[in-house]
């Protein structure tokens, strides 16, 4: 599909998209021509054309953005509290698949995730049950994520809690800031002993790494609410350090 505009593929599954029907059809015919050139055919019974909504690899793709598929939502919503470590891993696998829809997931899921650590005795208590219920609530209330657009103003916001790092990639589209993706990560035992300023700085680094596929080579804004970091990285402060 190299050189064909508006087409995504995963293995032998193809999605062709366009901003309107005319653009969609032009791109679709280009893809069909390419397949014909290399001697490939498609199964008409498995094709869906001119759709405004499509479920693809656990995601519901619409003209307005991306949502978790109803199948993924139901799997989490209907899950029972885990009874052993194997069931914990299975549940967390379901949750992690939809992680980009869930802010501060790592911190929220930490009481459950801790049960998978080596040497930890499995014990499902009140803290794990609260985390389980909050995760169910969070995913079922997930907002629609926007599609990333190269031409739009882009911002990464990062924050740190005592036990985890959280970040969000957003863009200003049509005069409104929309979420592209959330990301989060638990702190290691060593990182938990960092000062808060060090944690906040680490959050910025990890956020840029996590969203590097979007922002590498692009101009973007990096936002933190930690005032000491703003001071440390301000141009005035850096110039003063160089002067000394």
Residue ranges and their predicted role:
Residues 1-219, 228-238:
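Retroelement reverse transcriptase polymerase core
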Residues 221-223:
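C-terminal accessory regions
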Residues 238-244:
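Short, intrinsically disordered, charge-balanced linker/junction segments flanking boundaries
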């Amino acid at each position: 599909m190299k050189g064909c505009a508006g087409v995504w593929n995963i293995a032998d599954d193809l999605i062709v998209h366009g901003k309107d029907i005319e653009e969609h059809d032009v791109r679709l015919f280009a893809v069909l021509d390419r397949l014909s050139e290399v001697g490939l055919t498609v199964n008409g019974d498995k094709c869906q054309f001119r759709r405004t909504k499509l479920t693809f690899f656990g995601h519901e793709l619409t003209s307005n953005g991306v949502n978790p598929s109803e199948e993924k939502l139901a799997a989490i919503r209907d899950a029972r509290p885990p009874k052993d470590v194997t069931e914990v891993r299975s549940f967390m696998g379901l949750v992690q698949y939809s992680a980009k829809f869930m802010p501060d997931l790592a911190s929220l899921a930490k009481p459950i995730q801790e049960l998978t650590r080596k040497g930890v005795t499995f014990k499902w208590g009140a803290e794990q049950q609260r985390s389980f219920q909050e995760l169910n609530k969070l995913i079922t209330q997930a907002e629609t994520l926007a599609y990333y657009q190269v031409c739009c103003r882009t911002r990464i916001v990062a924050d740190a809690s005592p036990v985890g790092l959280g970040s969000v990639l957003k863009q200003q589209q049509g005069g409104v800031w929309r979420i592209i993706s959330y990301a989060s990560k638990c702190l290691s035992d060593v990182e938990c002993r960092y000062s808060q300023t060090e944690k906040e700085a680490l959050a910025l680094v990890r956020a840029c790494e996590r969203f590097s596929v979007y922002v590498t080579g692009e101009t973007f804004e990096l936002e933190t609410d930690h005032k000491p970091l703003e001071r440390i990285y301000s141009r005035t402060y850096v110039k003063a350090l160089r002067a000394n």
